[in-house]
Amino acid sequence: MVHSVDELFAVVVREADDDDARWVAIRELHALGTREVFERAAQLCRSSDASARIAGADILGQLSAYADEATSILTSMLEDGDPGVVECVVHALGQQQDVRTIEALARAAIHDASNVRWAVATALEDLIGDERAERVMLSLMRDGDTSVRDRATFAVGSLSDHDTPRIRAALFERLRDDDRCVANEAALGLARRHDARAIPYIAGAVESADGEIEEAADEITAPDMLTELLKARDALGDVHGLKTLINRCRARL
């Protein structure tokens, strides 16, 4: 069924409680990608109603034909007084995967609302190769909110293959995180980079049912890690978890 632009905008604005319907309509508007769609979305961004501003930001996020103009509008909306609006704006900027948004997103990374900072950790995950984005993500890995630290550590450790001494140091630091999920993500990030500093943590947790640890154990028992595993045994002793890792590694030779 073909919907008019009026009908699609009506769904996006009015169906706040039906997220599936909203995003179906938003995707149709993205597919149209006309100047009319851009202008009407920009108008929504100037509304006094927060839900309308959210709708406008969601639409502008992927209008590639008007990316420069959309970025300018979205960046200005980071000063919005409603954290829910700012969160959506951050996600919209993240959709653009444009290094020109990094400085604006860096400012949002110190927002008072944790949901905004969490969104920044998502928005920058594909830009970590840029040193500015890396710095922001490493800062978010130390955030006071557990969910933000977890998201940033997951993005840096598992979603990105970018590898620098700073990233490894930040992941190693998070091995001591008070939250087990964050620490597990850090262990996986180090294991993916074949960093032997993850071995003691993984050995101590290998009997757990945690999915991240199972994946980390698979990474750290790659055939080229046997020497490091044996060094760890010399340092730590023949502990059960380490013995398990060594046996798994030898079985892969």
Can you describe what each PLM-predicted range is?
Residues M1-I54, Q62-L63, A217-T221, L229-L253:
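N-terminal alpha-helical scaffold/docking segments in eukaryotic complex subunits
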Residues T122, T146, R151-S158:
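Alpha-helical adaptor scaffolds
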Residues D17-D20, R35, A50-S51, P83-G84, ...:
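Alpha-helix N-cap/helix-start positions at coil->helix boundaries
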Residues R180, E185-A196, P200-L253:
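Long, ordered, amphipathic alpha-helical scaffolds
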Residues D20-W23, E39, I54, E87-C88, ...:
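Alpha-solenoid HEAT/ARM repeat scaffold
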Residues M1-V12, L32-R46, A65-E79, D98-I110, ...:
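Amphipathic alpha-helical scaffolding segments comprising HEAT/armadillo-like alpha-solenoid repeats
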